[in-house]
């Protein structure tokens, strides 16, 4: 029974990480998101993302709806439902009447469930610097570094993706080999995440093992949510601003050692001989299959 209690406690902690940041300490008042808005998107490029959290489970994909937001000076890539969640949350937080809006509350919960990709990349096109924020897991991280330059090879091959004629290219990035399909009919050298530099918009890109698959499913003006922003540090009490190496190492450790680290972070207790005690942190590691394997 004590192990069941421990499992349930950790599970509840992990599934409420995002939600707990959107409430006041009293638990019944929505708190407006705190953002650093740097620009406004002129264009949205949408990508369906499928990724494996465990590379050994070949048919077990997590899905996300992501968006590349484009302005003259910046690119921002994130889960689209992050934008939706913040918008709904701020509406609920704006008045006592709004927080009772049952439809909005239900949409808020749905957006939380749909937000599954927890990296946000903001690229300054003039300075060629990228700031990345990662959320969820146990802690949140932020780092800024020179925007990576992809060493593309244009190779033979053609395809039709989302009704666009595409050509093939390959590259290696952060420990994975990628195959990309780009269209010269949209003369933007951009793509999902940090994949840029081809002579046309990337319509699909995936690693050779198909662990991470981005497929374009729309291009056009942002119908809503045009603000390009990262969160202010004070919005996440646990946001760690550090180097890329430290951030990605920490993020990987948080995934793999979640069951042990969460005992300390969430101050988990179990019953033993009639007393509540801290359990031993000797659980096996979980698998991780991050997009970036090397840094």
Region roles according to the model:
Residues 52, 61, 177-179, 187-224:
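Structured soluble/peripheral alpha/beta segments that form catalytic or ligand/cofactor-binding pockets
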Residues 3-13:
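Sec-dependent N-terminal signal peptides
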Residues 15-19:
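Sec/Tat signal peptide C-region and signal peptidase I cleavage site
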Residues 26-31, 181-190:
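Charged, amphipathic alpha-helical segments
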